[in-house]
Amino acid sequence: MKRRQTNLHTLLVALLLLSTPQAYAADASPSANCSTKCSSPYGEILGTTADGTSAYSNCKSDCVIFEPNQEQGVYSGIKWQCVEFARRWLMHNRGLTFGDVDTAADIWAIDSFTRLSDGSKVPVTNQLNGSNALPHTGDLLIYAKEYLGTGHAAVVLEVDRNKRLIRVGEENYQNKKWPANYARSIEFIARNGRYWLLDAYLLGWKKIP
C-alpha cells in the first residue's frame, strides 16, 4: 500500500511538472517541432514596423513552442504567436498590455487593458466589421475562432483612405518576409456610411485609446 501511494505521488509530481510552460520549453525546440515545411525558419525576423517593432517567424501556423517571451521583464506572450506581437507592439507604442488568453479570438471579450506605468485599467471597446468608422493606427484586428480554431490578431499600422487599404503588422499569419515595414495590406470598401474590411473571418477591431 505504501509503495502504491509513493508511485501515485511520483506520477502526480511528474504530471504537474509537465503541465508547466518551463517543462514544455525545456523539451520543445525548433529543431524538434518546427523545422519541417516552414514558410521561413523559426525565429527569423520577417520584418520591422516603422516604429521599430520586429516580427518573427513561427515556421508555420500550427507550430507551437511553449517558450515565453519577455520585454524588459514583462511577459509579452508565447514565441512567436500573433498574440505575442500584438501585446509587444502595444507595450512599445502605447504602454499597455492585456491579460493572458487561450486563443487570439478571446481578445474580443476583453473590456480593459492595463497601463504598464501604474497598473491602472484602460477601457477598450469593439467595433464590428461593417461599422460606421474605420480602425485607427494601433487598433487590433480580431479574427473569429473559426480561423484555424484559434482566431488571429493583427495590429493596424496604417490606414490609406486614398488606396482604400489597411496595412497591418502581425506574427504567425503567413510567416513570410514582409514587403516593407508592414506584413500585408487589406482592402476595404465603403457602403452607405459603413466600412467593410475584405478579410475572411474578421470579427472587427478592438479600439485602443
Predicted regions and their residues:
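Active-site signature of cysteine proteases
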Residues: 160-209
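Bacterial N-terminal signal peptides
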Residues: 10-19
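...with weaker cross-activation on analogous glycine-rich loops/strands in unrelated enzymes
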Residues: 108-173
